[in-house]
């Protein structure tokens, strides 16, 4: 029997401590050592000894195979059988350094391999990281140059230089502040520095420009530096605090995207705090001297001609700017102040028109735009129990269609280098779905019904056709494939979940499956939807064994039946030991050719306690059916998820989800009482993120209001300052229209951050206006004077923010495309809000003072009437 063979193996292969002997020379350990470690040693194991002394050995009754565990895993690389090794960084290791080391190892190893074996360097995420970092650094450098050019037109060259020097000082200091947050240098952290690039100089511009204005009044350099910094110190401090308050909500956004983006506010806030210290302490110190040292004189001599040219251009630009202020801005502002209600009506109408564009769907909202990657992945799910051979036929068909598409595209483009870099195939596993490498999990036996084909494309910069287009063409070429339960195509860089995902739950499973079919049909009817599927999967085919009543008369029990069938088909584990790094198990079971079909079970023989053997069919019955691959439950009810992908050029997930919820699901729930639903995937992620972002935005607005109320010592003036925020949002929305972008979650991130940046310029303008009023200037003229005097710093801070972000806004690389919406919101929002601030804030202040005057007169009139009524009574 199997048990007797297993016992013989255990008796023969043994490694057992036997105690020790305490001799005069010391302790000696005793050990019985006879562990068999290789297959051929097991062939001589004596199973039993006959009465005549002859031995029945294991090789006489069976075959010993020293091999690997049965597995359903197959990997191919460019059509060739392959084994895949993945290397990951650990701890604080640098991904780029690890990549370079592995690349060098492969180059060294390639020449040492035997003929017919090759080693290739496949998917390298560090290469993508390196490309993104290079791209962002390039954008940052270009943005820095644009900021300096912008500063040099508005300010004295030396002043522009010292203002710009605040950028590297703040950036370097930020690396110290972000250390506790475990932030690393990656795409998002570098983007955060780009966001801060234009904003960080705002306070330095205000301080530097005010120092420059005091110099023009004839003050000595030291006095001008002190007076200029002190005069704007309060508004500068509070402007930084409002910016910090605006970026703070981004740190507390819930959901996957909130965690993903949390590094941005950490870095921007760190940079802003350091820029405040630099602008109020370090910058005035630099500007307090005339710069007549030896280095300055040498620099002036070497670059005399360029400096002279710059001075002429800067003076001409300054004269032109002053003429524009006097001849264009001031007349427009005076006209707006004479007609404040008309001006406010025009502004509000523009705001309502923009809101209507968004609400009417003319500007669409997508939670996470589809960002193209350099990969096209096809996931194949066959019915549970499908063999590797059957799955392989479907995979080979898809591989053939993928190669057909490659030939078509290569012929169309005429490029010498193919559009494909590599083709990976995995049968028994879906490694991309597990977000690991292309290799299977160590020790996994694989699942023959799963497969995946992944195509690596040339980098997006080197091809004219996008991965989404390639995915669409491949989907059409593959067509309907008989056999798979689901066939899913994807080419996005990352995803927050399925764009359409609805979970249906019911206690009645039959009712649930019927509702699932109706929902799938409804979703498939929307234009632009694809890969419509549900999460319910039938399990593998099962043979359920039962003992016949007559078997008990032979002394057999159900346990006997189960044990003998298990020994024959799964195996009886006789031993388990370690051989090198391998875990070796000695299994005793039927040969593989006797474990291939259902007839092998029916034809096996069952041994009775008396030692007799009877046919399986005489003592057992078989019931064949399907089990369940997995059972999902929520609150005790069965749950099935229906999901689908969409083509964003044709359909909008938000609109489809809304239509399903309002026009389909209510009727479905009426037809199936007890049915419940909830949205999952991207929609659930969106709900979590937007709800927390909205709540945090309200808190941030309140914090900004409180911060503004302190320097103004007023409850009403902060409302005038904050009135610029909605118009910044208008600029952000129109910026998306101009750039042909949909609004996305990152657009909202930019809008929230914009709210703090926009109020800074309004704060500076109204602070100067209050100063003029305190000096006794008429209010109307004070508004014109404040707008004119603060025109240059307001325009300059807005332009530096915009130009700092401009390279990112215009970036065409797919690598940075998902970051562009936030840059557009900030850049265009601040640019548009500038004109509203210069005209709208004075108008808002004019309206506020008119309302305050009305109530003051009303209150004074009531007081006079009361006094007049009381006078006769007093006289009497």
Model-derived segments and their meaning:
Residues 88, 92-93, 99-146, 177, ...:
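Membrane-helix entry/capping segments
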Residues 145-213, 270, 703-790, 795-811, ...:
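Hydrophobic transmembrane alpha-helices and their membrane-interface caps
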Residues 232, 302-366, 788, 865-876:
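Signature of alpha-helical transmembrane segments and their immediate interfacial
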């Amino acid at each position: 029997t199997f048990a007797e063979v297993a016992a013989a193996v255990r008796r023969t292969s043994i490694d057992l401590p036997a105690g020790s002997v305490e001799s005069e020379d010391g302790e000696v350990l005793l050990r019985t050592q006879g562990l068999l470690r290789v297959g051929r040693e097991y062939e001589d194991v004596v199973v039993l000894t006959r009465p005549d002394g002859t031995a029945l050995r294991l090789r006489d009754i069976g075959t010993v195979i020293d091999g690997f565990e049965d597995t359903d895993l197959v990997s191919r690389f460019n059509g060739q059988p392959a084994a895949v090794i993945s290397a990951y960084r650990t701890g604080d290791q640098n991904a780029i350094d690890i990549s370079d080391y592995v690349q060098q190892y492969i180059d060294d190893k390639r020449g040492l391999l035997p003929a017919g074996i090759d080693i290739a360097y496949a998917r390298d995420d560090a290469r993508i990281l390196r490309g993104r970092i290079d791209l962002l650094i390039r954008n940052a450098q270009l943005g820095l140059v644009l900021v300096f050019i912008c500063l040099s037109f508005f300010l004295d060259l030396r002043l522009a230089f010292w203002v710009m020097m605040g950028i590297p000082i703040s950036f370097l200091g930020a690396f110290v502040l972000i250390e506790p947050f475990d932030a690393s240098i990656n795409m998002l952290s570098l983007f955060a520095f780009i966001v801060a690039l234009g904003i960080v100089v705002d306070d330095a511009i205000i301080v530097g420009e005010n120092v420059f204005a005091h110099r023009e009044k004839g003050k000595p350099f030291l006095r001008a530096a002190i007076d200029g910094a002190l005069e704007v110190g309060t508004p500068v401090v509070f402007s930084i605090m409002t910016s910090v308050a605006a970026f703070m909500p981004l740190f507390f956004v819930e959901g996957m995207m909130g965690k993903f983006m949390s590094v941005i506010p950490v870095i921007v806030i760190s940079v802003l705090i350091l820029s405040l210290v630099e602008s109020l302490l370090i910058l005035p110190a630099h500007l307090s001297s005339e710069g007549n040292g030896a280095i300055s004189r040498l620099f002036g001599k070497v670059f005399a001609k360029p400096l002279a040219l710059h001075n002429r251009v800067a003076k001409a630009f300054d004269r032109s700017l002053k003429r524009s202020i006097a001849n264009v801005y001031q007349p427009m502002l005076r006209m707006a102040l004479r007609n404040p209600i008309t001006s406010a009506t025009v502004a509000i109408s523009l705001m309502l028109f923009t809101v209507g564009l968004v609400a009417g769907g003319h500007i669409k909202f997508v939670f996470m735009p589809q960002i193209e990657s350099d990969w096209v992945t096809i996931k194949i799910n066959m019915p549970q129990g499908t063999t590797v051979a059957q799955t392989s036929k479907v995979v080979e068909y898809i591989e053939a269609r993928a190669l057909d598409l490659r030939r078509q595209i290569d012929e169309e483009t005429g490029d010498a280098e193919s559009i494909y870099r590599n083709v990976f195939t995995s049968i028994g596993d879906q490694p991309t779905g597990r977000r690991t490498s292309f290799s299977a999990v160590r020790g996994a036996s694989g699942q023959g019904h799963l497969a995946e084909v992944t195509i690596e494309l040339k980098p997006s910069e080197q091809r004219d056709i996008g991965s989404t287009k390639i995915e669409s063409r491949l989907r059409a070429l593959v067509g309907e494939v008989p056999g798979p339960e689901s066939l899913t195509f994807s080419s996005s860089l990352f995803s927050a979940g399925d764009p359409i995902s609805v979970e249906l739950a019911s206690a009645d499973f039959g009712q649930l499956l019927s509702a699932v079919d109706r929902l799938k049909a409804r979703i498939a009817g929307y234009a632009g939807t694809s890969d419509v599927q549900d999460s319910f999967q039938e399990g593998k085919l099962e043979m359920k064994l039962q003992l016949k009543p007559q078997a008990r008369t032979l002394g057999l029990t159900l346990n006997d039946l189960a044990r003998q069938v298990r020994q024959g088909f799964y195996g009886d584990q006789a031993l388990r030991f370690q051989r090198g790094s391998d875990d070796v198990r000695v299994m005793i079971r039927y040969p593989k050719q006797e474990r291939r079909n259902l007839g092998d079970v029916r034809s096996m023989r069952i041994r009775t306690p008396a030692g007799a053997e009877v046919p399986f069919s005489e003592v057992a019955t078989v019931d064949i059916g399907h089990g369940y691959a997995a059972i999902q439950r929520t609150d005790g009810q069965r749950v099935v998820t229906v999901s689908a992908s969409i083509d964003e050029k044709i359909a909008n997930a938000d609109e489809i989800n809304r239509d399903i919820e309002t026009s389909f699901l209510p009727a479905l729930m009426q037809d199936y009482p007890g049915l419940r639903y909830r949205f999952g995937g991207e929609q659930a992620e969106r709900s979590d993120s937007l709800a927390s972002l909205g709540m945090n935005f309200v808190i941030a607005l309140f914090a900004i209001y409180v911060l503004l109320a302190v320097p103004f010592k007023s409850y009403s003036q902060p409302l005038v300052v904050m009135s610029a925020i909605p118009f910044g949002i208008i600029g952000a929305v129109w910026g998306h229209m101009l750039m042909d972008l949909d609004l996305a979650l990152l657009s909202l991130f930019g809008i929230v951050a914009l709210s703090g940046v926009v109020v800074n310029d309004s704060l500076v303008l109204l602070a100067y206006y209050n100063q003029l009023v305190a000096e006794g200037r008429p209010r109307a003229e004070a508004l014109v004077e404040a707008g004119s005097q603060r025109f240059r710093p307001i325009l300059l801070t807005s332009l530096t923010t915009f130009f700092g972000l401009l390279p990112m806004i215009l970036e065409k690389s797919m690598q940075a495309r998902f970051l562009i919406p936030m840059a557009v919101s900030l850049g265009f929002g601040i640019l548009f809000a500038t004109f509203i601030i210069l005209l709208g804030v004075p108008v808002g202040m004019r309206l506020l003072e008119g309302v305050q005057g009305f109530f003051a007169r009303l209150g004074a009139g009531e007081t006079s009437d009361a006094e007049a009524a009381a006078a006769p009574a007093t006289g009497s």
